[in-house]
Amino acid sequence: MSKRIAAKHKIDRRMGENIWGRSKSPVNRREYGPGQHGQRRKGKLSDFGVQLRAKQKLKGYYGSIGEKQFHKVYVEASRLKGDTGANLIGLLERRLDAVVYRAKFVPTIFAARQFVSHGHVKVNGQRVNIPSYLVKVGDVVEVKEASRQMTLVLEAQQLGERDVPDYIELDAGKLAARFARIPELNEVPYPVQMEPNLVVEFYSR
């Protein structure tokens, strides 16, 4: 088992949920957390515990974003007009690695981060290798022509576990995707419930 797969399995087990909706998630086989104490009965979480869990789940879903970087996203969301929780989701969905994942150019968010970092992706015709780069409405994200026959990319096109959401306009033949608009929370195809307002409460303590 690769380190990335092991990391994904650990996140699923810790959350007790199949947060990416994968058929091979260990949560499909058992409902306790990782480690030797994972089978112990869990007590009721405090308000802080519920908020912390919501934050960990959202961070984990987007590839285990580091705390410093995730807090930076929250701060930016709080500065924007409108609901901070909705803004947080909008900023996370604008990340280049998230768009690459949503467009099904690669099979996982972890693979998307590495794929971008290795220079396989262009935005509006220019190579961008920063996974946290924020895509703007109308931007076109595409796989470099030289990278389109990679096994990782070809396999991702065959995945049936998830669909491309409506706010991503996909040209499958060219492996190009236009970021049409910033989505509402209920439009984002999370396999499990995400609660960004609890994340806001966590950071607002």
From Swiss-Prot:
Sequence ranges assigned to domain S4 RNA-binding in this UniProt record:
94-157
List the Gene3D superfamilies hit by this protein, alphabetically: Ribosomal Protein S4 Delta 41, Chain A, domain 1 (1.10.1050.10), RNA-binding S4 domain (3.10.290.10)
Question: Out of the domains of life, which is the source?
Answer: Bacteria
Keyword Heme in record: no
Alphabetized PROSITE patterns for the sequence: RIBOSOMAL_S4, S4
Q: Which SMART domains match?
A: Ribosomal_S4, S4
Signal peptide (UniProt feature, chain positions): none
An annotated GO cellular component? small ribosomal subunit
Question: Its GO biological process terms?
Answer: ribosomal small subunit biogenesis; translation
User: For this protein, what is any one GO molecular function term?
Assistant: rRNA binding
Q: Where is this region: Disordered?
A: 18-46
Tell me which UniProt keywords the record has, alphabetically.
Ribonucleoprotein, Ribosomal protein, RNA-binding, rRNA-binding
Question: Briefly, what is this protein's role?
Answer: One of the primary rRNA binding proteins, it binds directly to 16S rRNA where it nucleates assembly of the body of the 30S subunit.
What is annotated about its quaternary structure and interactions? Part of the 30S ribosomal subunit. Contacts protein S5. The interaction surface between S4 and S5 is involved in control of translational fidelity.
Could you say which protein family the record assigns here?
Belongs to the universal ribosomal protein uS4 family.
Q: Mind telling me which PANTHER family this protein's record contains? A: 30S 40S RIBOSOMAL PROTEIN (PTHR11831), SMALL RIBOSOMAL SUBUNIT PROTEIN US4M (PTHR11831:SF4)
Which named protein is this? Answer: Small ribosomal subunit protein uS4
Q: Organism source for this protein?
A: Xanthobacter autotrophicus (strain ATCC BAA-1158 / Py2)
Gene symbol?
Answer: rpsD
